[in-house]
Amino acid sequence: MDMELNNKTALVTGSTKGIGKAIAIELAREGVHVLINGRNEEEVERTVHEIKSKFPNTSPQMATADLVDIGQREALFEKYPHVDILVNNMGIYEIMTYEDVDDEVWDTYFRTNVLAANGLTKFYLPGMLKNDFGRVIFMASEEAVMPSGQMPQYCMTKSMLLSLAKSLSKLTRGTEVTINTIMPGPTLSENVQHIIEGIYANEDMTFSEKEKAFMAANLPQSEIQRFIRPIEIGRLAAFLCSPYASAFKGSPIRMDGGMVPTIF
């Protein structure tokens, strides 16, 4: 299916690995010129070369920056003053007890997971409205609506993104600009795969068997009993960026493998 995104420009934050990289790849597959973001210049450059080799008709660019830093954010704006698509994927997480989350941790998570995304959106949204086309996607989590209690500082920020997206969507009334949120469930990132391999390092099992054993022991509520693959989220994001998804406005879209047991 042609998503009709050829020659659009997209900034995908945190796009050198995991979900962000998968989204960047799937957008490039649709002919989008992707700005690859990360703090490590070598990783950014490597990802740009990888995408360029896979999709030679696109022009991926390096957007190396720590987007929590206002100065680096402003430098990025000067270099890339307009994008058609903004995917606010960058974020941090760590399992922590409530007792260990001090004010400094709260502040770090708020600045990284919320304020950076808000700052990018505040800069790029006016141009999208002026051109009567734009897509903003915030990456949240099923933890936004079903907090596990294992990382309250993370869950809070992801819930805030749902509210932010819904609020900002009101500004797009009558335009072809959309602002939505994707809530992925447990996803097979490089780090997750490494953890699973380590847990079952002494077992004579295929990775698929290790994955099923881990899910049964730790995430029995998952209805798919496997980790979501980043490419699945990438394809969903590409669709949401397309003209075919113009009726999604302020929507929190769950791709959680059935983790959340409620209808809403």
Where are these predicted regions, by residue range?
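Short C-terminal tail/terminal secondary-structure segment
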Residues: 6, 146, 238, 249-264
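Conserved glycine-rich cofactor-binding loop
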Residues: 9, 16-17
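Substrate-binding pocket helix/loop in short-chain dehydrogenase/reductase
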Residues: 97-98, 102-110, 218
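Active-site helix of classical SDR
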Residues: 121, 157, 165
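Alpha-helical segment proximal to the catalytic Tyr-Lys
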Residues: 126, 170-171, 246
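Residue(s) in the substrate-gating loop at a strand-loop-helix junction
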Residues: 141
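Short, small/polar-rich loop/turn modules that mediate ligand/substrate recognition or access, typified
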Residues: 173, 178, 248-250
